[in-house]
């Protein structure tokens, strides 16, 4: 499928929540990442994936965020209980104990939390990954790319439930071209950092068409 393969309706669906509301947001500031719970080799893979997706979007990275220090935090663990031992995490997430309990009860293996600035742009994101057998079965580069794609924009909960954002091309795992095109369009500076009107899907579609 080409970048033009997404219709306005398909684009809108990627940002439509379970309650029917439309919610689009991109990062409103440079991304300053920090990764917990991985070896240096995996850390390099995660940062490489982030650099690639940020470059695709035409966005920026930073060593630190002046307000938060790090504004994209990725936590890799084998058991959700490990989150309770992360220093000061309960200050960033006041309901940490409740979150850990819910993740355990739901047997989840991943969870994402976003925070937003006054303009509605993404201000911070927290990514939690429990490395169960399904997660461990994925190569590190595939796992990293998939997670970064899912925090570069505020997608709907079901955006990639039926079809992953990645595809295999010439033996390599790559971002599906139509998703890459959508990410580029989403970061076009003429578009707002956030939108709650489904008509924004038409603007994204127009930018994708203009880039062909």
Task: Give the location of each predicted region.
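Glycine-rich, aromatic-bearing surface loops/beta-hairpins
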Residues: 120, 124-212
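Proline-rich intrinsically disordered, low-complexity coils
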Residues: 8, 33, 94, 165, ...
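Long, folded non-catalytic interaction modules
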Residues: 41-46, 60-146
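Long alpha-helical, hydrophobic tracts
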Residues: 1-74, 78-82
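Short N-terminal segments
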Residues: 1-9, 94-102, 208-212
């Amino acid at each position: 499928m080409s970048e033009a393969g997404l219709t306005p309706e398909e684009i809108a669906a990627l940002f439509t929540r379970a309650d029917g509301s439309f919610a689009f947001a991109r990062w409103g500031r440079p991304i300053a990442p920090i990764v917990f719970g991985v070896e240096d080799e995996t850390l390099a893979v995660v940062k490489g994936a982030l650099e690639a997706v940020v470059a695709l979007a035409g966005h920026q990275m930073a060593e630190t965020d002046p307000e938060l220090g790090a504004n994209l935090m990725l936590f890799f663990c084998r058991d959700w209980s490990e989150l309770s031992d992360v220093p000061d995490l309960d200050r960033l997430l006041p309901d940490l104990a409740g979150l850990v309990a819910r993740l355990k009860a739901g047997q989840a293996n991943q969870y994402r939390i976003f925070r937003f600035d006054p303009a509605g742009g993404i201000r911070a994101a927290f990514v939690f990954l429990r490395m169960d057998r399904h997660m461990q079965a994925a190569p590190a580069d595939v796992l990293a790319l998939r997670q970064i794609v899912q925090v570069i924009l505020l997608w709907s909960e079901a955006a990639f439930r039926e079809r992953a954002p990645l595809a295999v091309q010439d033996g390599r795992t790559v971002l599906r071209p139509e998703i890459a095109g959508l990410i580029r369009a989403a970061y076009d500076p003429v578009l707002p950092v956030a939108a709650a009107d489904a008509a924004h899907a038409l603007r994204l579609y127009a930018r994708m068409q203009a880039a062909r």
